[in-house]
């Protein structure tokens, strides 16, 4: 029988000093011997997705104590990618994922906690905590802060749904008045919660459901709804049960690595493809799988993307639907249920809350249950329509569910948007180890696209070029040296894509980068080109005016330059010595912290995970 980890610091005469310190935190004689549950919160007043989490840790803590555990809360950092976007702050976003993973590992291992509740929400926080959970491999439950309600504004004769991307696009469009920009800005982000579309934060919180590590409804129930409180309370009760099952019942199947198997990662990727999730999820799933010791690679993602249909399109792919609409249609379980009917998921994988994913689908799929059932009540939870930063502040309900699987927010396989999914992996001589495109956000007219390369050595230079009208229809904007090493930090390219839209070029141009894109990006935006330029990737050899061919249906991207010419260019680059594979003319201050990140990170095709062998002495 495995011993409670916490006994390392709570049992025996020699631990008198440690127990004295535990007593100073409020523990009593009755608490020693109980499982010590760490609560990793991520409250901050910087981020709307986390501004309402201040009391969530203690809400979970009280429930843990009622269930027979000892709760100890700590906090991680959390960066708002939207606020950090478009300036030097974005260099810190992806590196913060590793810091979050490290901080959770440090706190849990230093204090010998027995189990973990992860209270996350936004872009790098959920992945960072997920990586930590895989490293630690102790009982864990994820519960997120929930999505923001969609913004709404009267626009002519219609009510228009909004999100932060609309604010960026309209602000860059000189044809839009200052007054209208102000209206959009004030309406785009009305409540606390993670931004309302299928952006990175919501995509990742949905994927924790598919991985089996969070409760049904976690990914889609809006942050403001009173029903979300029950998810936090259930998480508190459940984690104590899981801890006792493992340490007292020798149940290893409920550990993160017992749940998040290769089949579970395949389920998560199938969900991602079906719902047209953020391209960043590829990066984070690869990283989490690496931490879990699961052999899950770009080749698996490519295989899944070819065989799983696109069943849902949510903002930014369309403004018709946001996360609140996904919830009304049955949430993550609703999408998984349609994949299940199509025979496209592994039903037998375990979850923290049900014997198997298949059992969870049977219990929570709204299409299997009638009016008045528990699933119907859960998924009728609606937005309140009132601007607020307060969690659980409203209890509105939809009068009916969206059960239209032919033309609703979630479709069945027969009515899919496409029979191959909303994400695709492209390969070619300019991205030999692959690159990623969110096909759910690409207009059908440009699924095949050939254009002229316009080379920029930084995101800043590209933005200047776009705003100065240097880009015309038919151009392919190449932004390089923005990968994990080259940035460093692999900046998101939301501003370049938003500005292309504002210039009327959203369906007339493409963008290729070794950086990445915000979950709010749509259009022919291809990221994660691997190997990156700073690692000797061929994207660093492309020249102004080269022809680039993009063929999404055939999963191909090609720099129309002969092998001989590429070899000449590579030889010329290598001849530069220490100046090889570095951006020309770019002046960027890179702090020691970011240089340390760059020294150990890897390209996007591996999840930009840390590889310490790069700095270890041989």
Swiss-Prot record:
PROSITE patterns: ILVD_EDD_1, ILVD_EDD_2. HAMAP family: IlvD. Homodimer. The keyword Magnesium applies. It is an enzyme of class 4 (lyase). Pfam families: ILV_EDD_C, ILVD_EDD_N. Keywords: 2Fe-2S, Amino-acid biosynthesis, Branched-chain amino acid biosynthesis, Iron, Iron-sulfur, Lyase, Magnesium, Metal-binding. Binds 1 [2Fe-2S] cluster per subunit. This cluster acts as a Lewis acid cofactor. The keyword Zinc-finger does not apply. This is Dihydroxy-acid dehydratase. It comes from Chromobacterium violaceum (strain ATCC 12472 / DSM 30191 / JCM 1249 / CCUG 213 / NBRC 12614 / NCIMB 9131 / NCTC 9757 / MK). Its cofactor is [2Fe-2S] cluster; Mg(2+). [2Fe-2S] cluster binds at residues 122, 195. The active site is at 518 (proton acceptor).
């Amino acid at each position: 029988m495995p011993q409670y980890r916490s006994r390392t610091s709570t049992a025996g005469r020699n631990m008198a000093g440690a127990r004295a310190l535990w007593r100073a935190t409020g523990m009593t004689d009755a608490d020693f011997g109980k499982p010590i549950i760490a609560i990793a919160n991520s409250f901050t007043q910087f981020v709307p997705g986390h501004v309402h989490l201040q009391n969530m840790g203690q809400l979970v803590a009280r429930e843990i104590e009622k269930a027979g555990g000892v709760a100890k809360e700590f906090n991680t950092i959390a960066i708002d990618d939207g606020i950090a976007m478009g300036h030097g702050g974005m260099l810190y976003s992806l590196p913060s994922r590793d810091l979050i993973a490290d901080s959770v590992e440090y706190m849990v291992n230093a204090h010998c906690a027995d189990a973990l509740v992860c209270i996350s929400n936004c872009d790098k926080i959920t992945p960072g905590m997920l990586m930590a959970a895989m490293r630690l491999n102790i009982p864990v439950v994820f519960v997120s802060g929930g999505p923001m309600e969609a913004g709404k504004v009267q626009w002519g004769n219609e009510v228009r749904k909004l999100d932060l991307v609309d604010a960026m696009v309209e602000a860059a469009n000189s044809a839009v008045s200052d007054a209208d920009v102000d209206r959009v800005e004030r309406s785009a982000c009305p409540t606390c919660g993670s931004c309302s579309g299928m952006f990175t934060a919501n995509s990742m919180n949905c994927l924790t459901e598919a991985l089996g590590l969070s409760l049904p409804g976690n990914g889609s129930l809006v942050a403001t709804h009173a029903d979300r409180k029950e998810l936090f309370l259930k998480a508190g009760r459940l984690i104590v049960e899981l801890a006792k099952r493992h340490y007292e019942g020798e149940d290893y199947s409920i550990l993160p690595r017992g749940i998040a198997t290769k089949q579970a990662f395949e389920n998560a990727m199938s969900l991602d493809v079906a719902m047209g999730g953020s391209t960043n999820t590829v990066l984070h799933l690869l990283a989490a799988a690496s931490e879990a010791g699961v052999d899950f690679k770009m080749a698996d993602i490519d295989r899944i993307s070819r065989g799983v249909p696109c069943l849902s399109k949510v903002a930014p792919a369309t403004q018709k639907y946001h996360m609140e609409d996904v919830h009304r249609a049955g949430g993550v379980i609703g999408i998984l249920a349609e994949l299940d009917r199509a025979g496209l998921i592994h039903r037998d994988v375990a979850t923290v809350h049900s014997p198997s994913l298949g059992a969870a689908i049977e219990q929570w799929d709204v299409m299997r249950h009638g009016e008045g059932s528990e699933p119907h009540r859960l998924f009728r939870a609606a937005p309140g329509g009132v601007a607020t930063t307060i969690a659980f502040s409203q209890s509105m309900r939809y009068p009916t569910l969206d059960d239209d699987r032919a033309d609703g927010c979630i479709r069945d396989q027969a009515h899919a948007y496409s029979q191959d999914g909303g994400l695709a992996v492209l390969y070619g001589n300019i991205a030999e180890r692959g690159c990623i495109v969110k096909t759910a956000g690409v207009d059908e007219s440009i699924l095949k696209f050939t254009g002229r390369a316009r080379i920029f050595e930084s995101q800043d230079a590209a933005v200047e070029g776009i705003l100065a009208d240097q880009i015309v229809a038919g151009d392919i904007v190449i932004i390089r040296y923005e990968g994990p090493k080259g940035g460093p930090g692999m900046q998101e390219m939301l501003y370049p894509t938003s500005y292309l839209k504002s210039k009327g070029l959203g369906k007339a141009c493409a963008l290729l980068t070794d950086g990445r894109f915000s979950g709010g990006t749509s259009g022919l935006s291809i990221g994660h080109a691997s190997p990156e330029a700073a690692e000797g990737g061929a994207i660093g050899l492309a020249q102004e005016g080269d022809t680039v061919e993009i063929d999404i249906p055939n999963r191909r991207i090609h720099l129309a330059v002969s092998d001989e010419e590429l070899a000449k260019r590579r030889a010329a680059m290598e001849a530069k010595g220490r100046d090889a594979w570095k951006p020309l003319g770019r002046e960027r201050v890179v702090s020691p912290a970011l240089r340390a990140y760059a020294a150990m990170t890897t390209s996007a095709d591996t999840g930009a995970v840390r590889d310490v062998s790069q700095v270890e002495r041989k």
